[in-house]
Regions:
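Phosphodiester-processing cores and adjacent nucleic acid-binding clamps
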Residues: 1-123
Length: 123
């Protein structure tokens, strides 16, 4: 039975991740994992690097590691979007199922930085 890590933080998760994407993809290929996800805190900065690393490892080893695009967002109830209230933040892991989901996730994360940033990007 195949195993896939669906919750991984990389160097793009400030103060929380240490893993380099290329190293993670290489290790996933060594362990014959069919896929690996990147779910950094509040950002989608590593998605192109993840895709490129998966393509590169397939060319190098012949093993395909499918990239799974995701984000661990800081979810907050509507009343916590006000800046005069201490925000209640909950971690919510979101994974893109397909291209439409990927674009929706990009939109959510972008809006969290542009419209709802208060100490952290809030969704």
């Amino acid at each position: 039975m195949a195993f896939v890590h669906l919750h991984n933080h990389t160097e793009y998760s400030l103060l929380d991740g240490l893993t380099h994407i290329k190293d993670m993809v290489r290790r996933a290929a060594e362990l014959d994992m069919p896929a690996v996800a990147v779910t950094d805190h509040g950002v989608m900065s590593g998605m192109v690097e993840l895709s490129d690393a998966c393509d590169a490892i397939e060319k190098e080893t012949g093993k395909r590691v499918k990239p799974i695009f995701g984000c661990e967002v800081y979810f907050t109830p509507d009343e916590s979007l006000r800046k005069d209230v201490k925000p209640k933040l909950y971690h919510l892991l979101l994974l893109a199922k397909n291209n439409e989901g990927y674009h929706n996730l990009l939109k959510l994360v972008s809006e969290s930085h542009v419209d709802n940033f208060y100490y952290k990007p809030r969704t």
